[in-house]
Amino acid sequence: MDIDKNKRFGLTDEQVKQSREQYGRNVLTPPHRTSLWKLYLDKYRDPIIQILLVAAFVSLILAFIEHNFMETIGIFVAVFLATTVGFYFERDAAKKFNVLTALSEEQPVKVRRGGKVMQIPRHDIVVGDVVLIEVGDEVPADGELLVSTDLQINESTLTGEPITEKNTEGGGDGAYPRNVILRSTMVMNGRGEFVVTAVGDATEIGKVAQKSTEQTSVKTPLYVQLDKLASMISKVGSVVSVAAFVIFLVHDILTNPAWGGKDYFYMAEIVLDYFMMAVTLIVMAVPEGLPMAITLSLALNMRRMLKSNNLVRKLHACETMGAVTVICTDKTGTLTQNQMQVDELLPKDDNQHLLDVAIAINSTAELDEDKAIGNPTESALLLWLKSQDKDYRELRHQAKVLKQQPFSTEKKYMATIAEVDGEKYLLVKGAPEIVLDLCEMEERYRNQALRELDEWQHKAMRTLAFAYRRIDRGEAASEKSVPTIGQLLSAKDFTLQALVAITDPIRKDVPAAVKECRHAGIEVKVVTGDTAATAMEIGKQIGVFEDEAENIGADGDMTSLDQQMITGEQWEALSDEEAYKRAKDIRVMSRARPTDKQRLVAMLQKHGEVVAVTGDGTNDAPALHYAHVGLSLGSGTSVAKEASDMTLLDDSFKSIANAVMWGRSLYRNLQRFLFFQLVVNVTALLLVLGGSIIGTEMPLTVTQILWVNLIMDTFAALALASLPPSHEVMNDKPRKATDFIINKGMAFGILFCGIAFFIVMFAMLIYCERRGKGGVDVHELTVFFTTFVMIQFWNLFNAKSLGSNRTAFRHFLKDKGMILVLALVLVGQWLIVTFGGEMFRTVPLSLTEWLVIIGATSIVLWVGEIWRAFKRLLVKRKN
């Protein structure tokens, strides 16, 4: 298919089909992934698994001599299950993450097809398409420019050049001609149109496979903390296991006459048994279920957060959102509905046609029927033209654009030199204070305009002004001699055309969400480009000034409204020391530029705050990078999304509050799992040590402990990780990022429960030891083992209610994961007891014995329920 570079109509549907068949889809081949077998074998690199395998092979050698393979088979089965279950869940989490990252290929791109501008997913672009790009867009495919207006591209992903000037003429001394633009580069300034020349793997980025093969693996703060915890527990477990090994072996040498003989094989077997016990103690001490619990929690949270309009791009964002203390939010789209409409337009000049042309050409937005594509403010103006029965496309066709300076947040205006009805004009649209400063007008008219603007701004309306200046024939004898826009602006003799008030209503759920965040101890700060009056009104409407009693500054004094508000210009003028002092008191920053937002984030972080920032524009990228959690908007630019950790698909502040709840609930669920597993570990360690002291047979065998620790804890991780988020966590104040995951209350609970369970189980062991003539028999040890498992079974209910005074049965029927796990543990224990035999050192129990054990051990749950009811009563009396 020939590509006509001068073609502005775009492809027809038939041409699109032909191009896709010939050149393929605009999708990069995914990077080579590690095979499933390698991923699975990686699970066997775990030091604990390797120790178990060594023990299992030694046991296997002895089993061949003794012809008793049951324990060996039990160990191999336990290792296989532990590695396979871990592999399955990690693989499942990876698949879920791949599904989420694939959504980036759905990113909308503006193209012209059949003469109309429309949005299509990035992967639907074909060779020959005419693509429209502007500031903040990621170039979706390779192509050659048709139209270029002050276009600057960041080609650092390919050439290392951060800024490259682009035009339609080509040439230049760069790595690529100036009229060539490449996939995955970023538009930093201006706008343009290009015809696609290569898609997918045929693009330059596809050839070098640079971006597509990036594989990053960053350890999150929580992982680092849990690594320390696992290391500490491993050391304790190692000391205990060595001590138990020595005590058991010395006791056996002193009491067993076989050590005086020459049966070296029997002696080796005894040493192996105690070695296996020592290894098992290490296995018991190390919380192997932790990585799985984290993986599960993150994977489940990511999937559920997607349903609540939070697309998590970086895993650490899940956990960090739970520790956020300050949210710096934009106004447009996040706090408002992002459905802008012209509320009022006051003409200040008689030339209505010139105003219509100014609105049409001083804009990068497009309309697809009534659907707006592009900047919401500019879209509102085009919709206003349509409501006046005027076609913006026809107006653009009537005017010949000679030069154009795109809108930027730094300059706060857009300017276009155009020829209209044979005359040349400089047409300016922008912030009223900038545009009015360019205009030549009587003071009374200027004051009237300022009063009108002030009235609108106090109603939280966005205001714009339009002005023009006729370019005299003496200034421009020909098109080539058109002076620069900067030269014309310096004259300051413009004529004011119109003042415009654009309204964007506050989202209905935002005030409640802000209140919820403040109740949760999170400060909300509004950082907006609007005027001080507009920003203050927005702040009042959403409730950041809601309770004057709470307006206490960082120094403990009441802060006035003046101290809580600041403009970007005032903020820039402050020294670092002054800015540091004021940062915490600021509630609203108006007329803010991206650099102001970044500086505010930096100062808040110096105070030790954990900061989340929203941003939708390219210039927000530095602040999004700087923040602990960068939150881009679904409607934002590609650059902003690239810099962010999470994307708010619906742009709403309510989604930020939800993300905080998810983050805190995730942390709480991990604490619940830790509580459950460490209680099991403490109880088992004390039992084995206690058994060594009184000289009885090991109360729990290697295979029994492996079942409890590797398999049952895996089920517990699944149950507790799948618990839904709770709004209760929003009643707490934010945790410090440095806080240890096991707080004082948890540590007390772990030790209390662990010691209490040990006392009960140890008393049972001594009773059985003294009652029987030949020590504890297999039947009694089976009852002992089942009692131990059932105590942990009921304690899972207490773990579910950790950090809450609510009953463990609240929403029980909705917790399907919990019900499934409880059923699996019960069925698994029954199968082991009934059919485990020599492998698990068990004999079948009668129905009566099962009922007695289940009933007696349920006291663990009922004591917990009484304690929670007592705490509820205390809270009720306090309130």
Where are the regions a protein language model picked out?
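Transmembrane alpha-helix entry/boundary detector in multi-pass membrane proteins
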Residues: 777-781
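Conserved cytosolic headpiece of P-type ATPases
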Residues: 1-734, 739-742, 755, 770, ...
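Long hydrophobic segments that form regular secondary structure
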Residues: 766, 771-772, 776
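Generic alpha-helical transmembrane segments
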Residues: 712, 757-758, 782-797
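Alpha-helical transmembrane segments of multi-pass integral membrane proteins
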Residues: 749-764, 790
